[in-house]
Amino acid sequence: NTEYPWELEKERFSQEELENRDKWQSIFMPSGAMIAGRVDQKHWLTFGTPESLPLLYGNYPVLMTGDNAEAVVRVGEFVPNDEIENYRSINWSSLPPGKDLNVRMSGLVWPEAAQRIANSAYLTRESVGKGQIILFSGEPNFRGSTRGTNRLWLNAVVYGAGLGTDPRVYP
């Protein structure tokens, strides 16, 4: 018997419950903590970056991706946990069986904030017309101290004009 996360209605939260949780959890957002980022290794925006990337995170917006957007880097890295046999809901997202999500790398990250930002997008790319929009949730080049996210920013600047856009030139 196959179970899918969208079929587990008993574990899903209502819209009102999600809004109440978000309002409460936003009070506890980190200020300058390093959190783990899960990287899509096959995307051109992540050329030269490892699978897991430290992200400097402050009180930044929490990005969600729609159907037509790509979440290139997500908050939290999967760690094995054999005790978990079913999908679990963490606010608006689900965790697969046998996996747990590690958000904090260093610094103060309250559990409420970790749940709020878990599985959210740090870097997104979306096609719009003949171009694209690339969004960062934080500051990828903050004082030049975060070299991993600096690489993401450089890839966006250098490759963004050609990769992911419409290459045709019409007269």
Question: Where are the language model's segments positioned?
Answer:
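A glycine-rich, often tryptophan-bearing local segment used as a flexible ligand/cofactor-contacting loop or short
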Residues: 1-48
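Active-site neighborhoods of enzymes that stabilize oxyanions during catalysis
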Residues: 60, 64, 77-78
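General marker for long, soluble alpha-helical cores
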Residues: 71-73
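Extracellular ligand-binding/catalytic regions of CAZymes and related secreted enzymes
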Residues: 23, 42-44, 48-55, 66-69, ...
